[in-house]
Swiss-Prot record:
It is an enzyme of class 1 (oxidoreductase). It comes from the Eukaryota. InterPro entries: Dimeric_a/b-barrel, EthD_dom. Its EC number is 1.-.-.-. It comes from Pestalotiopsis fici (strain W106-1 / CGMCC3.15140). This is Probable decarboxylase ptaD. Belongs to the tpcK family. Probable decarboxylase; part of the gene cluster that mediates the biosynthesis of pestheic acid, a diphenyl ether which is a biosynthetic precursor of the unique chloropupukeananes. The biosynthesis initiates from condensation of acetate and malonate units catalyzed by the non-reducing PKS ptaA. As the ptaA protein is TE/CLC domain-deficient, hydrolysis and Claisen cyclization of the polyketide could be catalyzed by ptaB containing a beta-lactamase domain. Pfam families: EthD. The gene is ptaD. The keyword Oxidoreductase applies. The keyword Phosphoprotein does not apply. Disulfide bonds: none annotated. Residues 28-111 form the EthD domain.
Length: 138
């Protein structure tokens, strides 16, 4: 077993990418199926090119299939990999984002309940193989 450093936090460098996680809730009265349909067929197609323009390297959605006591009403979580939080902030200031996406979110999401976390992302297995960090081709 590897020996633990006396002060491991002092020797760690941040990973190259941040992961912004958005915990999303569907609008009251909307079914989970309708939420997922709107996200995959309307919102995601409108959003993905803008995210790529502002440096998002990966965007995934996880739709809940089982409820946990810690978050019994969570509908989905979105994960965005990016280099800096500033890239995300710039995207939200884009006139196209303001004109098209803010209003779209109100059609399917309970935005008052949404929550976000941000942290460094590490990757240890990719495509079924052990790796030593997250890398993107471009």
């Amino acid at each position: 077993m590897a020996e633990m450093s006396k002060n491991p936090a002092s020797t760690l460098k941040p990973s190259r990418y941040l992961c912004l996680t958005i915990c999303g809730y569907r609008k009251p009265g909307m079914s989970e199926e309708d939420y997922r349909y709107h996200m995959t067929q309307v919102s995601a197609p409108m959003t993905k090119d803008l995210m790529a323009k502002y440096g998002v390297k990966r965007w995934t959605m996880n739709y809940m299939i089982r409820r946990w006591p810690s978050c019994p009403t969570l509908t989905a979580s979105a994960k965005l990999c990016l280099r800096t939080l500033e890239d995300y902030k710039r995207m939200k200031q884009d006139p196209w984002y303001k004109e098209h996406l803010i209003g779209d979110h109100e059609k399917f999401a309970d935005t008052k309940r949404s929550k976000m976390t941000i942290g460094w992302i590490e990757e240890w297995i990719s495509d079924g193989k052990p790796v030593d960090g997250l890398e993107f081709k471009s």
